[in-house]
Amino acid sequence: GVIYASLAGIFWGMAGIASEYLFQDQHVTVYWMMGVKMSLSALTLLGLAYYLDGKKIFLVFKSFKDILGIVLFSILGLAGVQFTYSMTVNYSNATVATIIQTLGILPVIFYSAIIFKQLPGRKQWIATITALIGAWLLVTKGSFNQLAISKEAIIWGIFLMLTQAGNSVLPVDLLRRHNPTTISAWAMLVGGIVFEFIHPVWKSVPKFTPAITLNMLFLIFIGTALSYYLFVKSLHLISATEATLLDTFEPLTAALLDFLIFK
């Protein structure tokens, strides 16, 4: 579980850099990319889930509770966190977005304390305080009189923090009854359908170059499909709090690659 969550964080950090390149340098629209990457990732994961479990992947539709759970997980978690992350990157950069995303540990800790009566341990408190200090330095650069990032980035960052918490908490109950691949696949498909309604694939189509195509393929199959498969699988083995804490590999990866590539 620890390895799965750590690898997911690393791949997400790499995907953040690919997103920054596509959105800021190549002006690919966030809405177009969301629909395409989620739909193709969903088909990839559904194919894998069917290979592993066959017709069992359709058992989720026998329970209204499970259907509702997948829809909520998609909108408020899996799809929501990808969209708010992309918008935060669009208004700032991958490093800023991933650092803000780590603050999702705060609502997860409060949720665990209230619902499961699990108070944070010393390591969790240290991680929480460090995340808060880091976020404050990021947003203000140590000054009480000015913001170092745009207001749009802060607003989307708040939604990013909340959807990251949803991404960690909402699938836990579903994973008690269903395969992680199946849950990820259906939630991804719901998100893809929603964003195709918002922004159909034939509108604002980018001009494809080898660099754009390679970044898109990486973002779709590694940064989305594989990353979410690993993260949701980790939730089957470790707690949501532990998985979210291990997501700190994401900002470290993004910051390092951002420095090496864009500086």
Residue ranges of each PLM-predicted region?
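Specific transmembrane alpha-helical segments of multi-pass solute transporters/efflux pumps
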Residues: 50-95, 101, 137, 220-238
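Membrane-interface helix termini and inter-helical loops of multi-pass transporters
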Residues: 17-30, 56-60, 87-90, 139-152, ...
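Hydrophobic transmembrane alpha-helices of multi-pass small-molecule transport proteins
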Residues: 45, 111, 120-142, 195, ...
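Glycine-/small-residue-enriched transmembrane alpha-helix faces in small-molecule transporters
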Residues: 1-35, 146-173, 193
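Helix-helix packing/entry segments at the starts of transmembrane helices
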Residues: 9, 36, 78, 82, ...
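Cytoplasmic-side transmembrane-helix entry/capping segments in multi-pass membrane proteins
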Residues: 2-6, 63-72, 120-132, 153, ...
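Transmembrane alpha-helices of multi-pass small-molecule transport proteins
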Residues: 26-80, 107, 111, 163-170, ...
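Hydrophobic/aromatic residues within transmembrane alpha-helices
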Residues: 22, 33, 88, 114-120, ...
